[in-house]
Amino acid sequence: PFTGGVKVWAGDYSDCKDADIIIITAGASQKPGETRIDLLKKNASIFKDIIERITEVNSHGILLIATNPVDILSYTSWKQSGWPASRVIGSGTLLDSARFRYLIGKNKGIDPRSIHAHIIGEHGDSEVPVWSLANVAGTDLELDEETQQDIFDRTKNAAYEIINAKGATSYAIALALDRIVAAILGNEGSVL
């Protein structure tokens, strides 16, 4: 009752022909102790077929990639599809930035939506926190280096903790993808 009607069905690639946005989440699951980069060979092989099949039926949509390693697979999908770079997008560090803001907010006792802070770079083990620009409504966070490192380590390791606890991540990335789609369809011009 809160989200309206949702229709779910099993289909095939021809169902993508009129899609404005095609979200790809397919791939091998990350196992406990496995890095996102460890998934590259398996998921690159899976993606080769997926991208080929999608581009056979759709040449106008936007590809939104969530499968890890997301940055590399977004790049290879762009190259393989032959589509403009502006139409092949990865989920990037949006989820990392959301986790980062949540942990900062938890530390400061402030709603994470009021925290301005970003994780940049590659999604995963080499991501970078931008502490120099992190603030609450323009006010410095005043976090010591030890607290900053703890928050960043917890941000970076959140997915591994979830994978160890329940085997996979799903809900948070789904919310991140929903946010990206809303920004695209609403032509928001948002920095996510």
Predicted regions: what they are:
Residues P1-A19:
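Conserved N-terminal Rossmann-fold NAD(P) cofactor-binding segment
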Residues F2-V6, V57-S59, P84, D111-P112:
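Short helix-terminating capping/connector loops at secondary-structure junctions
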Residues C16-L63, T76-Q80:
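Rossmann-fold NAD(P) dinucleotide-binding segment
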Residues K17, K41-D49, I72, L95, ...:
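Conserved active-site and cofactor/substrate-binding residues in soluble primary-metabolism enzymes
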Residues A26, I62-D140:
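Rossmann-fold dinucleotide-binding core
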Residues K31, I72, I163-A165:
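Short, solvent-exposed loop/turn segments at secondary-structure junctions
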Residues G105, G109-L192:
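Long, compositionally biased stretches enriched for glycine and/or charged residues
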